């Protein structure tokens, strides 16, 4: 025995041998532990996307290519068809990522197993622009943000649709100036929603719809406001790229990105300070003149950083989601004259048209009574959800209820740190729930009472469900109603192939714009 010890003694003193042995032991112990966990939870293997090889480099190149072409979501649909499963695993540079469109798995990630998943590196992705807000935080920080912001989206605040009218009139002037010629209405909608969102949030609009041909309204520091809108757009594009890079987000941190973030922060801090400088009496007086998000938040916190971050988080959500929804709506209405005419008839009957439009009757309550308008909005959010793909990361060893085994009905194992990507876009187009015409724009499908559950989640679900969903729906419905009252002809001027190329960053919109004429 002593001879044996003497013979191995030199190796025991070599640190790399000891460390190697420990690593092998740890690896084996981990494998045994995972196997026991899988057996305990009846987990089965899920399919893998078999075309991945060479460290996923061909796939990564293809993903970058189709994203540039605006075909990322359609490419993902083809992958589902190739794999023939609702849930599968794909390895990106050797790291497994679970991809799912199964409503039961989405329910688990977002609701029933909510505490097993977090945002992962999202905070790091978005922090340079959005800081610590409701969309970037997990845990107690998120809970505090949500409790602070929830009262700001009460029915009383959502119902103030008349505040949209001055901005809508400015939009209408741009359309009339085109005199029936082709316009990119998506560009106008993005300007409209940043104007309405900044007035709602800051108490002062950036008036991005202001134009040399349109003389109103006179504003101070218009150049500063214009640069804010442009900087916010640019910074947001960078954020989208950082999000898709996941753990390699830090690659996107150039001087242009940092400059845009600074301009946005400087602008926002100016209005935050204006709110903080007001006395309680002045804030109350301002509130009597109309609801302003910032002034209500100032009553809850005096921390300028908290105010800035929450305002920018809400601006991100409130501006792009509504603009995208409106753009896709007018795109599909222009493609489907029958639907356009039927919607017009309902609006005319409810609220009049042209010079006889009864604008004061268009309220939160009356819009909800417009059944066909509701069907159109539901169908648009089904086909074009604002956030088509989202991610969560497992905070501990856990499972998803389905996706394993030959039939896909067994639970699957999810290791700690594993990313789960769920595609609302794909779920909303499943024939199992929406029939063989699931890819078609058909508002009438909502005439039937459907128990869709987690197969229809345009505003996410569970504890993190969108606080502003009624606000967005009301704003979009009001704008559609008013534009159809003003313009009774809508034509699409776009000969590009269908489906349209879609830009997918943080939210989704038409990659190349929506070109129509209104008269």
Swiss-Prot record:
Heme binds at residue 466. Its cofactor is heme. Its EC number is 1.14.14.-. SUPFAM superfamilies: Cytochrome P450. GO terms for cellular component: membrane. Induction: By N-alkanes. The keyword Coiled coil does not apply. It holds the Pfam family p450. It comes from the Eukaryota. InterPro entries: Cyt_P450 (IPR001128), Cyt_P450_CS (IPR017972), Cyt_P450_E_CYP52_ascomycetes (IPR002974), Cyt_P450_E_CYP52_fungi (IPR047146), Cyt_P450_E_grp-II (IPR002402), Cyt_P450_sf (IPR036396). Gene3D superfamilies: Cytochrome P450 (1.10.630.10). The keyword Heme applies. CDD domains: CYP52. Transmembrane segments: none annotated. Keywords: Heme, Iron, Membrane, Metal-binding, Monooxygenase, Oxidoreductase. GO terms for molecular function: heme binding; iron ion binding; oxidoreductase activity, acting on paired donors, with incorporation or reduction of molecular oxygen, reduced flavin or flavoprotein as one donor, and incorporation of one atom of oxygen. It is found in: Membrane. Belongs to the cytochrome P450 family. Together with an NADPH cytochrome P450 the enzyme system catalyzes the terminal hydroxylation as the first step in the assimilation of alkanes and fatty acids. This is Cytochrome P450 52A13. The lineage of its organism: Eukaryota, Fungi, Dikarya, Ascomycota, Saccharomycotina. The gene is CYP52A13.
